[in-house]
């Protein structure tokens, strides 16, 4: 059983209330208009759940990873795009929290707690799963000049602060990668298109173009060449957050399918009384609960500092939860029949949203590779 203290329960109840009263009524419109919900960002910030992982000295609440996973889950039950805003904020913030100097943390982290947005920029057109093939390069020492291109960057064009990875010494391979903090409006930074996506349409994904992007040395995160450890630590937590999002999305789809089955009458009775429907819902519920428990266990390992278990369990949680969400949302559409396929009902949106979670933060095939390597230690 998961035991939360009174304060944690209050925070989680606040997240559930925001999901129910603020996010859910906006979810369909956000998806239809492909609209970034600034109003929801403001509500998240006002209630302390935009950056809950931050220590109190930087404006956060010092939440555990388990509590943050539960917050993401609550929001994702009604709108996966809005949950992705929380995830992207954490993804962009954590490289600074994990590796930044005290001065860098004091400069940027409090603003993120108040509503400024962050982004995590590693992926490139030719460097997705194979991140070491990135082509973004730097030169200089006191002032760095960075050139290259990033793509599919969540929050990219709206972020005030970007944690960006580049090679400072390509000849060193993984040991030649360094992260930097890039500010919106920096000289040499420009934006391409915001992607037109199948799902998660309330979240912005952008191209970033870097042409002799000027970054002062004090905006380097950690020492030169230490970026791969920072990158992998951040990716592990990204995968945990994606798993929590998938669990919430699956639970939201179950809730919709159950409510529909109780009121939909066919053959003179609610379809909830049909064994075939009961079997489908039972499988959906069991799969989601299993994914939830694995996700919570991964979060606990992070909270407990069991670093040797984190990569494997975060990867397992991510692929199990997202595969479950894809299956559950598909079955929710099936339970609701023709109505489930219509945009008048949220399970249509949920099914489209679920697909991305099998892809981002590392495809589920790569996640299985990570787990296999951890098991065999190769």
For the regions a protein language model found, what residue spans apply to each?
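A short core secondary-structure module
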Residues: 143, 147-191
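Short Gly/Pro-enriched turn/cap motifs at secondary-structure boundaries
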Residues: 126-129, 152-155, 169-171, 197-204
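Alpha-helical interface subdomain recognition
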Residues: 1-82, 87, 99-104, 115, ...
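Short, structured patches in soluble enzyme cores that scaffold and shape functional sites
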Residues: 122-124, 150, 166-168, 181-184, ...
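A short, Trp-centered hydrophobic/proline-enriched beta-strand micro-motif
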Residues: 114-123
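A structural signal for short hydrophobic beta-strand segments in well-ordered beta-sheet cores
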Residues: 136-140
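Long, acidic (Asp/Glu-rich), low-complexity accessory segments flanking structured domains
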Residues: 212-230
């Amino acid at each position: 059983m998961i035991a939360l203290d009174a304060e944690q329960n209050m925070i989680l109840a606040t997240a559930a209330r925001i999901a129910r009263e603020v996010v859910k009524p906006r979810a369909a419109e956000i998806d239809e208009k492909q609209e970034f919900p600034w109003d929801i960002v403001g509500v998240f910030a006002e209630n302390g759940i935009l950056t809950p992982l931050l220590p109190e000295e930087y404006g956060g609440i010092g939440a555990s990873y388990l509590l943050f996973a539960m917050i993401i889950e609550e929001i994702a039950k009604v709108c996966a795009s809005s949950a992705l805003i929380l995830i992207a904020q954490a993804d962009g913030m954590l490289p600074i929290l994990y590796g930044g100097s005290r001065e860098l943390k004091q400069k940027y982290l409090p603003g993120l707690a108040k509503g400024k947005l962050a982004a995590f920029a590693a992926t490139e057109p030719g460097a997705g799963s194979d991140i070491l093939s990135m082509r973004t390069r730097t030169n200089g020492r006191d002032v760095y000049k960075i050139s290259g291109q990033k793509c599919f960057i969540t929050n990219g064009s709206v972020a005030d602060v970007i944690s960006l990875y580049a090679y400072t010494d390509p000849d060193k391979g993984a040991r030649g990668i360094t992260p930097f903090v890039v500010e919106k409006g920096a000289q040499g930074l420009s934006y391409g298109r915001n992607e037109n996506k199948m799902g998660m349409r309330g979240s912005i994904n952008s191209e970033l173009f870097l042409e002799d992007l000027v970054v002062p040395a004090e905006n380097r995160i950690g020492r030169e060449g230490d970026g791969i450890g920072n990158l992998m630590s951040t990716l592990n937590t990204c995968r945990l957050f994606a798993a929590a999002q998938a669990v919430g999305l699956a639970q939201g789809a179950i809730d919709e399918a159950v409510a529909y089955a109780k009121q939909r009458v066919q053959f003179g009775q609610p379809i909830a009384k049909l064994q075939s429907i009961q079997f489908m819902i039972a499988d959906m519920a069991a799969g989601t609960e299993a994914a939830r428990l694995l996700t919570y266990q991964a979060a606990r390992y992070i909270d407990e500092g069991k670093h040797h278990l984190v990569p494997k369990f975060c990867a397992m949680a991510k692929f199990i939860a997202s595969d479950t969400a894809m299956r559950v949302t598909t079955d929710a559409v099936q339970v609701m029949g023709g109505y489930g396929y219509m945009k008048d009902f949220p399970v249509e949106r949920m099914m489209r949203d679920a697909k991305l979670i099998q892809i981002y933060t590392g495809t589920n095939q790569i996640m299985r590779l990570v787990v296999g390597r951890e098991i065999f230690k190769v």
